[in-house]
Amino acid sequence: MANKKIRIRLKAYEHRTLDTAAEKIVETATRTGASVAGPVPLPTERSLYTVIRATHKYKDSREQFEMRTHKRLIDIVNPTQKTVDALMKLDLPSGVNVEIKL
């Protein structure tokens, strides 16, 4: 797999679990001999939902809920077969969405 690059995008609602997952990926890749660029923090998506508190009236009384999606980008340059196998077997925390592009 010479001169190849693996791009890993991580998404999660909690930044702590996202950072631990990124740390595990970087540690696994460097342990198997690949060079790593990242984790690069990408812009956080912020979704805001406004809901009326009362069931039928009192439209002036509203409540707002916010959902933030944190993202990280990791590039693994010149991965070996050992690196790919180790990444496939890696156990990441739940709640982290992983997208891998070769």
UniProtKB/Swiss-Prot annotation:
Keywords linked to the UniProt accession: Ribonucleoprotein, Ribosomal protein
Database matches in PROSITE patterns: RIBOSOMAL_S10
One annotated GO molecular function: structural constituent of ribosome
Record flagged with keyword Ribosomal protein: yes
GO terms under cellular component: ribonucleoprotein complex; ribosome
Gene3D superfamilies named in the record: Ribosomal protein S10 domain
InterPro entries with a match to the protein in the record: Ribosomal_uS10, Ribosomal_uS10_CS, Ribosomal_uS10_dom, Ribosomal_uS10_dom_sf
Gene Ontology process terms (BP): translation
Function according to Swiss-Prot or TrEMBL: Involved in the binding of tRNA to the ribosomes.
Subunit-level organization: Part of the 30S ribosomal subunit.
Assigned protein family: Belongs to the universal ribosomal protein uS10 family.
Record's protein name: Small ribosomal subunit protein uS10
